[in-house]
């Protein structure tokens, strides 16, 4: 709607309708000292001058080379992602409730669900969630519904922000959350096994984990199932070009953040979360599912189905109260996957792995620096420094290098640990520069 200011006649009519003589009389109850008479705002400016001012502000930003990950990653986004997702047919906050006029969006999201299932090795996916952290919380609540139990065991190597979101969702619901500290950046298998009881609904792990370590979760899945619990796996989608799928490891519910699939960092959002499971649990999936059907003429079509949200059914029977729509971000994820293709995703994952391995070897050879463990990694790894990692990272930032994520703020006793991330966008020269600056800072 265009902005249409009130005319003097509009103002007179409104004042007459409420029985007030003037605008001043309307605001008379507010003490004069509290009423603003003027505002410290500049006069209007031309478009050309405004652009000049904005460019000057942008010029004050310090360019840095980023080796920061921890959940959100600096991946290349093909131009086709912006081009297609920006088309008027897709670029909308509208939820496709009317299938007769939303077939394009519905089919695109149906293909998204298919892609997520193939990526994770699962059988069904919904049409997206808010982000990776809330997707993990939704998976936890789903496990509670499926099993009828009220206890969760979560590994300490799961992203600390995601763990906090799970606690926020569940703390006041009478759910017992047992957190098992990681051991040297890896899941403590004996402790996880010992924590399982006949009240445990699920075991929650992340792969690759927050430290960057990649583990085979198959044995943990078997142990969980033997105790009647589910395995929830949080994954990094790009890594699945190389890493064994969570479905193949025996996971019952798989979640993750889709930011790395064609969505920019953009100060932390927006993004989308994905969730996938087996057909057995399809009616417990939160959010919306796009289904394939036929119309009255026998033609193939797509519709929203199994919308077990509180807007559609009785609140106490709803699987979630998800309302806002992340479909545009999920669409970007689908376009990204379609543009790189199956073989391209493998190549992309291998490029991330290879560059990280080069960086790992280079940084690990610096005097006083060692790796947290010898487990395989994808594009993140944790190094142990002879100094406080936060102080070292701050010093390198002054040199134009965002060196990684210091762990002291998230894990007790790990003040000297730094998680370094190397995506396909980092060059050999940039990695060499990181090693040089790090060595100089020690």
UniProtKB/Swiss-Prot annotation:
Sorted alphabetically, the keyword list is: Oxidoreductase
Q: Which family does it belong to?
A: Belongs to the GcvP family. N-terminal subunit subfamily.
Q: Name the species this protein comes from.
A: Geotalea uraniireducens (strain Rf4) (Geobacter uraniireducens)
Any keyword Iron?
Answer: no
Which parts form a coiled-coil structure per UniProt?
none
Record-level Gene Ontology MF annotations: glycine dehydrogenase (decarboxylating) activity
The EC number(s) given in the record are: 1.4.4.2
**What is catalysed by this protein?**
N(6)-[(R)-lipoyl]-L-lysyl-[glycine-cleavage complex H protein] + glycine + H(+) = N(6)-[(R)-S(8)-aminomethyldihydrolipoyl]-L-lysyl-[glycine-cleavage complex H protein] + CO2
The name of this protein is: Probable glycine dehydrogenase (decarboxylating) subunit 1
